[in-house]
Structures are given as C-alpha cells and as structure tokens.
Amino acid sequence: MWCPDTPLVTYMIDMIVFSCRRFIPVILFVFTAVCFYTSPATASLNKYMAKHRGIEVSREQHKRLADYDKLIKHFCSFSFFEPRHKVNPDFIRALILAESNCKSTALSCKNARGLTQIIYTTGKQAARELVQKDFDYKYVSKEQLQNLQPEDLYKPEVNILLACYLVAKYNYQNHGKLDLVVSAWNAGEYSITDNKPAQYKETLNHIGKVNGYFLYLLKNKQSFN
C-alpha cells in the first residue's frame, strides 16, 4: 500500500517463498511499501528498517556463505508445507548473516547455536516434525533428527535444514510476511499479536537487519549463480 502524503517509504518483502509454476518457473516476490504512520509500533519498526536499509555483504562474507551454498540450495528445494512453495535461498543467507555472520560454532548467551542460532528446544521440536515428513533429506538422516542433541546444531547441514523448515513453517503461519516470520524466529512463534511483530528492540532490529541483507542479496544475485 502506498502512502502518497508520506515522503519516507521503506520497502519490505512480504513473500519469502517462491512458487514453482508449470509454465513460469520464476521466483515470485510481493514488494509492499511500509508507510511511516504515527502508530508507535509501526514507527518503531520503520526506524530499524531505515537503519539497515543500506547494509551490504562484504567480499569475505560472500566467501563464507559460498561454503554453505550447496546445503542452502538443497534444503530450500523442499516444499515443506505447500506444493511448489519453497523457501528463498537468499532469505536463508540473510538469516545466516544476521544471526552468526556465517560462524557455524556461534553460541549466544541464550544458548542459541550454529549458523542460524537455533535454540535446542525449538530445534528438537522441528526435528520431530521433519521425521514425520516423507522426505529423504540426503545430508541429514532421520535417525539423526530423531536423536538430535544440542551439539548437532553446530553442524551446518543440520542447522540449515532446521532453519529452512522453521522459516517455511513461520512463513506458512504468517502468510509470507517477513516481519512476522523474523519475529517468530527471534522472539518465538507465539510472540505475534494483532498481526504485528513482537515490540522488543532486539526483535525489531533483527527484522530490519534480515530485511536489509535480503534486499542486498536479491539485488546482487550474480554472486550466487
């Protein structure tokens, strides 16, 4: 939605999955303009969106991401919740950059682990759900998922698989709205009220950061072709 009376507009991407159609196998994105309303919640989010609007990915970060490119592309090829709807690889790359700066051994003060900083209880539940699905994940066995241990979250193949699944889940639950997906990721899937992200500074900053990286990667796709 456009707000013609508002001079400042931040662009957000509402769709973080793409639909593989039979005749038009293109990535489908819906770009919407987030207007600077007077609502405190919206104004607060806009501040962090603007803060990270010009973020870039360095040469070194590109090189680190390339180490995980095979795994990202593979696990983003699964349609976990809807046929032909798959997680955009660039969103996973953006999440990795924002969460750990591509460090597979990263550990937060809240015991979030690995490339995408997954909490063990969240990862364990996601692993149980993945076991029930009729997929061969190739790089991660169902036995490994069934017996997931905290240290497994440091393994890139496990961490990226869980991240792709959780992003697909939150995307499905929140109708592809990036701010709500990242809010669910950062503050928990029950952090969303009235179709708005959690109003924590950390969460709002994280939404802006992931969105900034995502936009940069979309504009510079040749780096991963």
Identify the residue ranges that each predicted region occupies.
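Boundary at the C-terminal end of the N-terminal hydrophobic targeting segment
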Residues: 41-43
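Catalytic glycan-binding domains that act on GlcNAc-containing polysaccharides
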Residues: 45-225
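Bacterial N-terminal signal peptides that target proteins for export
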Residues: 16-27
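Bacterial N-terminal signal peptides
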Residues: 26-35
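Methionine residue identity
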Residues: 1, 12-15
